[in-house]
Amino acid sequence: MDVTVSQLVELFLQSPLVTWVKTFGSFGSGHQDNLTLYMDLVDGIFLNQIMLQIDPRPSNQRINKHVNNDVNLRIQNLSILVRNIKTYYQEVLQQLIVMNLPNVLMIGKDPLSGKSMEEIKKVLLLVLGCAVQCERKEEFIERIKQLDIETQAGIVAHIQEVTHNQENVFDLQWLDLPDVAPEELEALSRNMVFHLRRLIDERDECTELIVDLTQERDYLQTQQPPSPGKFSSPDSTPSPTSSLSSEDKQHLAVELADTKARLRRVRQELEEKTEQLADTRHEVDQLVLELQKAKQDNIQLAADARSARAYRDELDSLREKANRVERLEMDLVRCKEKLHDVDFYKARMEELREDNIILIETKAMLEEQLTASRARSDKVHELEKENLQLKSKLHDLELDRDADKKQIEKLLEEYMVLEMAQKQSMKESAHLGWELEQLSKNADLSDASRKSFVFELNECASSRILKLEKENQSLQSTIQGLRDTSLALEESSLKYGELEKENQQLSKKIEKLQTQLEREKQSNQDLETLSEELIREKEQLQSGMEALKADRARQIKDLEQEKGHLHQAVWSLRERPQVNSTKDVEKENRALHQAVTEAGSKLSQLELEKQQLHRDLEEAKEKGEQAEALEKELHRLEKENEQLTKEVTSLKAATEKVEALEHQSQGLELENRSLRKSLDTLQNVSVQLEGLERDKQQLGQENLELRKMVEAMRFTSAKMAQIETENRQLEREKEELRRDVELLKTLSKKSERLELSYQSVSAENLQLQHSLESSTHKSQALQRELSQLEAERQALRRDLETLQLTHKQLEGAEEDRKALEQEVAQLEKDKKLLEKEARRLWQQVELKDAILDDSAAKLSAAEKESRALDKELARCRDVGSKLKELEKDNRDLTKQVTMHTRTLTTLREDLVLEKLKSQQLSSELDKLSQELEKVGLSKDLLLQEDDGHGDGKGKTESALKTTLAMKEEKIVFLEAQVEEKESLSRQLQIELQMIKKEHEQLRQTQEGGDKAQNALKRPPGKVTSHQEKEAWEPSHKEATMELLRVKDRAIELERSNAALQAERQLLKEQLQHLETQNVSFSSQILTLQKQSAFLQEHTTTLQTQTAKLQVENSTLSSQNAALSAQYTVLQSQQAAKEAEHEGLQQQQEQLAAVYEALLQDHKHLGTLYECQSSEYEALIRQHSCLKTLHRNLELEHKELGERHGDLQQRKAELEELEKVLSTEREALEREQKTNAIATSENQRLRGELDRISFLHQQLKGEYEELHAHTKELKTSLNNSQLELSRWQVRFDELKEQHQSMDISLTKMDNHCELLSRLKGNLEEENHHLLSQIQLLSQQNQMLLEQNMESKEQYHEEQKQYIDKLNALRRHKEKLEEKIMDQYKFYDPAPKKKNHWIGAKALVKLIKPKKEGSRERLKSTTDSPPWQLEPSDPASPSPSQALRSQTENPDNPPSGPNCVEERDTHNGPVGKGPGDLKPKRGSPRGGSVDRTDTSTDPAVKSWPSEPGSRTFSTSATTAALSSSTPIPKHLGRTKGCNSDDNLCEPSSEPDGPYHRQQASRPNSLESSRNASSNSSPLSLKGSSDHLHSRCESFSSADLIPSRDPATLSRDGNTSGRGLLGRHEYPPPRNGPVSQETIQKKGAASTHTGVRPHSASPSSEMVTLEEFLEESNRGGSPTHDTPSCRDDLLSDYFRKAHDPPALGGQPGPPARKDGAKMPTSFVAPTIKMSINTSEGQQLKPGHYVKPNLRPSEAEALAGMPSRQVQPPQSLSLGRPRQTTMTQNCHMPVSRSASLSRAFSLASADLLRASGPEACRPESPQKPGGHEAAGARETSTHSLQGSHILARERTPIVGKADSPSPGQGTRGRPLDTRRFSLAPPKEERLAPLQQSATAPALATGCSSGSNPQIQHFSPTVAPAVRTKSKVPQHSGEVATVAPVRPGLGTSEGDGGPGHGYSEGLLTKSPGRSSDLPPHVKRGPDDFSQGSSSKSTPASPEPGGDPQTVWYEYGCV
């Protein structure tokens, strides 16, 4: 038996349940045998301890800790355990234990049997079920997971037995459900039937057993009555009761009596209940129907409840996801910020790599130079000898040079004679020009004769000027040849200057590096501050923890007052989280301290590394100092270069590291900011309406950010669609969740009502009502959580959108996602368990209804405690999560620091390796340099032998070539070393062979070059000797012969130079080839570096993963330590409780004695009570019987009495009938018996009826209550439906809002796309125009250099220019005063409403240029014949064409000129400053009445200038002409009466002429002429310049036509200056009235006084200073100065020149060539551009004075009436074409232009807006807006040189459409300044009449297509007015900045304004202008920009500040 028991015990102890129990601490820890272990388990002490851990709720029952094999104590412990398990299952887990409970008696009496072991297994199984489902289930499951796999499987099977098997444990959670699915109902009903059967069977068995036992007891009691004594006699037979004492027998008798009484009661109740059952069955049948209906309602409610439960699960999962998403959001924000930084880092990396490459190259160069210098130091002795020989040769050359100087002096004398002759011719030409001007003033009546006369004079003058120019150029070429010979000797000295410049550059680099070091120091300081902030945050956390502790202490005190007797248990429970949290906080603080210390240590390491690097630098410096031997300056420079390269490499490494740390710190700061922002957004979401409004604002901001993102990251555009779809899906999910939440709310309300109804039913339990109220509070909390979840979901939706982007971009995020999914799975499991717990809590609430009042109170108190504990736990968890996040941040920082340290170590190793490699390379390079030097020496020796008399320049060149070859060798060597180190020797041999071959080739080429130079150098000696021989002959022919010989010699020198340059070019090409190879190798190196960087990133990711694992390990270890600490605390508490328990046991023992005494008394009393009760019952029965008998007897007595009386009365009768009565008596007695029986039955039935009626009333009450309950449910359902309908309405509203926001978002996206496309077009055109500007700047520089040669002419003409400039300045001051007066009347134009007109304009602007060009081509073909007139000399002159067109005024003019004419007439629509009344709705487009409206244009044009700015505001389009051009067109379409008011004839004799010239049509014509020709004029004759500007010479750039005031100003400036008419130009935007301008112009015509400008530009500038500044700054206008001697002659020559300069302001290029005054002579600005005819085209060629017809002609036939027959005759069409083709010559660009261009484009964009196109939207829907679009780019570039000087011109410029923008005409190529197609389309494009170029800007300047409607009625009226012709554009300066430069200013005309506009931009060109023109850019810009501030981009700003912001001279 012992063996079997031991085996059973072993098997039992090896079972998985026991192994699981062993995980609970001390059990089985000691070395005990199996039996003791088993007995310890059976005693129940340890199992009770486990149960205490599972269910820490206090219980009053004390466990017996010292069993000592006592059966009763063991049974007591086990019964306590089973009771606790049962209560825990029912109350906490909401489950019923259906299985038979473990038999405690069997375990206690016979623990070692197999059955008892099975019972113990049951106990362990139930304990396992509790442990797996309790609150600490995670901890217990973790313990189970640590066991073996087999034991785990066994435990899982046991758990399934408890949780899943309904036969063991029955789940009561379905009671919570209002209704259950039919399938589930079936399964439940089957289980219930099965359990019911089993329970009934068990009940029957128990009752039978009780009956048997009672019978046996009664029998025994009857057989053996209890003896009076305590002990029975020893002789008595042994019986079961004999052993019992008398007390026990009494006790048993009392119990038997109790059971009998109970049996009786039970039987009575059973009978009553059977009767009640029969009665209620009928009611049940009636209620079944109602129940079915209720069931259907319940089914629906159950489905809703199920969905609500599912949504609870989802809510929990969503909460977890929200927590997870917060983390992911933080990661996302970091990644986003890093993404933003990635582009910057990429650019920074590329820049640093480029800098590295440059530094490496410079290092290599310097090393080569060092080696070369060392070699040179070896050669010094030989070179000294050569130096002596060269000195002797130099002496000989100096003698030759002296002879050359004498010859040059003779030539200069001859040149002076020629210059004097030229000056005379200039004076004559000036006189002729004056005469022409006089004639033009007096020749209004006879147009044709006047034109022919002007043409003849211009032709004569131009022919003379051309001859003089040719002679001048020939002389200049000879002088240049002589100067080149003298400059050759000075080149060697320049090289030292270059080296010094390089040294300065290197010093600048050193300064930059020092600044970088300072930044690094700052970044280190920032890191220190960061660490301090972290410490502060840690302190804040500590303070927060202390506050939490204080709160907990307060809560503990409150709970102590409430729960006095439970104080110790609650205190122990609350101390645990405090201890744990404090320990965690301390650990985290330690970790943070460690991280901070590690960061500090790493920073110190970085500083140490920097110091080591500095030490390395110092060592390198010392080594460099040792290299000084010979040529100290060269060595010093080389050392500095080497030091710089080393410093750069070291500092770059350090800066990169510091920058990385800075960015990381910035990333952390940004993360903190993002978290704060996210908190703010969550708070904002709480209020839904405000949240929606803020969402709109946020969407707007997000749209802006998206636009920026679209510009910065275009590659994300494809992902946007996916993100939008995901966004919609998320919104749908959000809406579904909202619906679910609403359903949950309704369900919660229903549940509240049900609970209230249940409370009304169970009104007896008041304390249960409190518990139900607490449940309602919980439901409200759930509702709040649901609302919070809605807000969180919205935040999560945004976060998810960003997350999806980052998941696609980042690979590491995918791994994190997988890990997070696993966590989600675990969290979902936990969530399910929590849901089960919640269900159990609900079941507890329902079960408590059945429990007594005391238990309900205890449960409510326990619930309060649990809530407080939950709150505390939630707080602790929040704190723990925050601490965990801080830990993660800290670990990330530590990881980053470790990574930085590793990178530093790797960089150190790389530096060491690179140093070693550089040493090897330097040694190999030294060898190579020695070999090469040997080759160089041999070459030098050969050169000495072949060319003994070569100069030192050849040697320096050969040395440079050798250094270049050495550099190439080094590059090839480095490439080969990177590719293959093994083939190094082979590569070196190949390179040596190549170098030798190259040296041989160089030697051969140099020998040939030296021979050619010798051949060239010999003739000078001969020439000089010949000159000496012939110097004695005095004849002039000999001098000319000498000049011819000098020319021949120069030609020979040029040829030889060309041959040498070709050879040099070949060598450069070879060098470029080698450089390309070097670049390819460097790219390969970069790819390798990228691969290495990728591998490093991979390693970093792996390191981060390992770090994460370490962190997890550390967290687990910390948790383990915390659990062990908790266990120790619990043990100590247990020990204390055991001590208390022992004390209580003693008390219990004392109480037990008292209890036993009381029990005995109770037994006695019980027996007495039973006896009395039995007697009482018997008496009651007797009493009832007696009562019934008494009643019967009384009735009988009464009846008998009555009968007795009757019998006495009838005695006689009765006596007779006694026999009959005797028989009847017998019958009556029988009847009495039957009646007595019937009455008794009747009474019994009446009692039963009363009882049944009472039951019926009770059931009725219940039924009414149920009916009321159903009514309440229906009302609640109706209310919920109403709420649902309200929420649906709300949802529909929100949906509509969302759809509207989606529509607005799509609109914004479209707008963004339009802007991006427009930006791309603008950038393309800007790049194109930049290249053109560069070419123009180069040509301008060349021309300026040519102009500088003739300095004497400058001095002679300087006084005239200065006088005229002074007069103009004075005039400008007057104009400024009047303009400032006009500011008072400034009234900004009302803005239009339609913002989308700008968008339409944008769409049209984006149209391709080709369509516009085609349309313009069609329009040019459709234009009148004068437009495309062939170049036949026999063809009719433009004057004829003009006449023909003026004769037909009704025909609207076609081509671009129509636009300007329409400008003039449709003024009300074009909202320029001059059309205030038209803007306000004046219907008179071009009627005669317009004269009155614009009589005072100064007053009317000024206020309305913002309206004109609206033209320019579409800076994005920047296509429309300036604000001022429009007003004066529109304000004075007729111009007749208004011009009379605009002048003051009293002061000047020329006043009437001024007035007429200021008239509107003339200003229009002059504006056309100026716009088409002005800028080419202003180009100083550089046709190349104009052509290179390509389309940049838009009408805006070329004096756009809308502002005749400005046109007159710019067009006539130069002419006025020459003639003494200093008509002051109006402001660029034309704010000044023409009246004031003409008055001043007239006054200045006679006075000639020079006005002084108050602006800084009024300072006197000498002509030489002006030119020097222009040469230094690179004139942005690209105009090249030419000889000033032919200034006046150039005017006539320019008038005859074709518009090859791109349509210069001369009449031929103007739209209205006929409007040029004949008397006006533009200053000659010469250009050395040769046409195909061999003539040099001068800028002034186009400035032919044209005769201006009447204003009616100007209005009615601007394009048609070109009253310039002489001009058109002199304008050879072939010259037009050739000049346009020559316009492509390249020019150098000044450095300031690029910046000016960027500023211009920025200002244009700043000035833009949707309102910019408002005035133009009705004008020309198709073509014109598109035209403006293309012109923006051209104008922005045209204005780029202008912007360098002045900002305001840009607006005007931007406003005028580019010449190629009008859809009516061919795209105007500003290089040609005509509408003719480009030269690719036609070979003779410019064979038009002289008016063809005028058409060019006619289209462009007339940017306001409203002016199309030309009213011919105005023509006659206007024709009578203008009698004085205008000088339209005779200034050869760059196109004016202002678009509207009209000729309406009297004689000033376009020439003045034009030269002004150009001078503002090109100081270098002013020397060529007349003196009044040379007032400089300052004067004119001050005069113009200060007055035109309303049109400037910064209207409120000071014009002077605007001027100086862009830089004046």
UniProtKB/Swiss-Prot annotation:
> Where in this protein does the record put region DVL1-binding?
2007-2009
> Compositionally biased, Basic and acidic residues: which spans?
1025-1036, 1410-1419, 1681-1697, 1866-1883
Known outcome of mutating residue 2009 to A: Abolishes binding to DVL1
Chain coiled-coil ranges: 247-425, 456-1008, 1190-1384
The annotated region (Disordered) lies at 221-251, 1002-1036, 1410-1716, 1757-1787, 1808-2009
Q: Kindly state which keywords UniProt assigns to this record, in alphabetical order.
A: Cell junction, Coiled coil, Cytoplasm, Guanine-nucleotide releasing factor, Phosphoprotein, Wnt signaling pathway
Which Gene Ontology BP terms does the record give? apical constriction; cilium movement; cilium organization; cytoskeleton-dependent intracellular transport; microtubule bundle formation; mucociliary clearance; negative regulation of canonical Wnt signaling pathway; negative regulation of microtubule depolymerization
Q: Look up the record and report any one GO term of the cellular component aspect.
A: cytosol
User: Gly residues: which segments have biased composition?
Assistant: 1943-1954
**Domain of life assignment:** Eukaryota
Q: Which Pfam families match?
A: HOOK_N (PF19047)
Chief subcellular location: cytoplasm
Per the annotation, the residue ranges of the short sequence motif PDZ-binding are 2006-2009
Q: Which parts of the sequence form the motif GBA?
A: 1652-1683
Boundaries of every Calponin-homology (CH) domain copy: 11-131
Comp. bias regions, Polar residues = 1440-1449, 1761-1783, 1898-1911, 1981-1991
**Which InterPro entries did the record assign?**
CH_dom, CH_dom_sf, HOOK_N
Q: Which residues cross the membrane?
A: none
Q: Could you tell me where the Low complexity compositional bias lies?
A: 232-245, 1430-1439, 1510-1524, 1562-1581
The entry's localization annotation reads:
Cytoplasm; Cell junction
**Keyword Coiled coil belongs to the record:** yes
What does the function comment of this entry state? Required for activation of guanine nucleotide-binding proteins (G-proteins) during non-canonical Wnt signaling. Binds to ligand-activated Wnt receptor FZD7, displacing DVL1 from the FZD7 receptor and leading to inhibition of canonical Wnt signaling. Acts as a non-receptor guanine nucleotide exchange factor by also binding to guanine nucleotide-binding protein G(i) alpha (Gi-alpha) subunits, leading to their activation.
Q: Assembly state and interactors?
A: Homooligomer. Interacts with DVL1 (via PDZ domain); dissociates following initiation of non-canonical Wnt signaling. Interacts (via C-terminus) with ligand-activated Wnt receptor FZD7; competes with DVL1 for binding to FZD7 and displaces DVL1 from ligand-activated FZD7. Interacts (via GBA motif) with guanine nucleotide-binding protein G(i) alpha subunits GNAI1, GNAI2 and GNAI3 (inactive GDP-bound form); interacts with higher affinity with GNAI1 and GNAI3 than with GNAI2 and interaction leads to G(i) alpha subunit activation. Does not interact with GNAO1.
Q: What is known of its domains?
A: The GBA (G-alpha binding and activating) motif mediates binding to the alpha subunits of guanine nucleotide-binding proteins (G proteins).
Tell me what this protein is called: Protein Daple
Originating gene: Ccdc88c
